[in-house]
Amino acid sequence: WPSDFDATGRRIAVIGSAATAVQLVPALTGIAARLDVHQRHANSLWPKPDGRYPRWYRPFAVAERGVFRALGELFSRGLDDRSVLGRAHRAITSWRLRSQVRDPRLRAQLTPDYTIGCKRILFSNDYYPALTRDDVQLLTDPIARITPTGVVTRDQAGAETEREVDA
């Protein structure tokens, strides 16, 4: 990303919807005039445990690594769809999507068609809300070509853009 690039008022196409896009799209909303997000596959998205640690917690930070290792083990056992944890994974991701995306069509586009854990699980608190904005469009039709003026999908969707970003 060029350090001198100013996205203000620009029409931007974000090609991809994985980890980079999950960070980039919310950052560009409200700055760019329009975002077209080109998605090939939906991702499993979990809440991002973001926030400040309270002062009382700081002495326990050393033990945190062990806690996260234990949680990782527990988490990986939940990738089996038949397990209680697997059902919990599905319930959490489904609830998160329903609570943040009201449009059923957009929600369907954002629902993974594979078992959780088959692809990288992403963490974000603001990606889904960013995609519900009027100035953001999620495009799931395959890209047919990239022209000097923008990205064109197989169904001819897409519009002129001033910058394409591979994410």
Segments predicted by a language model, with ranges:
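A conserved short coil-to-beta-strand element within the FAD-binding core of flavoproteins
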Residues: 1-4, 113-116, 136-154
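Rossmann-like dinucleotide-binding core of oxidoreductases
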Residues: 1-102
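Helix-loop-beta segment of a Rossmann-like dinucleotide-binding subdomain
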Residues: 106-118
